[in-house]
Amino acid sequence: YSLLVQKIITTIDTDLTADLTLNVLAGKMNVNASYLSTLFKKETGNTLTDYVNEKRIQHGILLLHSTSLQIQTIASYCGIPDVNYFTKLFKKKVGKTPKEYREIFLKGGKKK
């Protein structure tokens, strides 16, 4: 990846709770938002928003596996304060709601 895209990825991975919108990230890097959007998509194959959401959902999965935190708290820790939006995104990416996912994981864990 180019240095700019590497910096964006590092910024995203470092703090998922930050405001990670295209305009904010472009401003932090002193580049045009349209340029950043095009470059990020060209180099990663994903839009910036999709990349951020993917990372947030991956973090949510990790927290569902490793903690007993409430879904609302997990959503906040993933940078999505609206639990309904988090649930919608999670279901779109994973195919199950966070609650369903946790229940399946816990049942699987008990069988082992």
PLM segments and residue spans:
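Residue at a beta-strand N-cap/secondary-structure junction
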Residues: 2, 19, 68-69
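Terminal helix-turn-helix DNA-binding modules in bacterial transcription factors
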Residues: 10, 14, 42-81, 103-112
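Short helix/strand-capping hinge loops at secondary-structure junctions
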Residues: 15-20, 47-48, 97
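C-terminal accessory/binding modules appended to enzymatic or scaffolding proteins
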Residues: 18-33, 37-38, 42
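Residues within helix-turn-helix
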Residues: 23, 34, 70-73, 83-84, ...
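Residues within the alpha-helical elements of helix-turn-helix
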Residues: 28, 77-78, 93
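Short hydrophobic/aromatic patch on the recognition helix
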Residues: 36, 40, 85-86, 90
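…primarily DNA-binding HTH/wHTH and HhH modules…
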Residues: 88-112
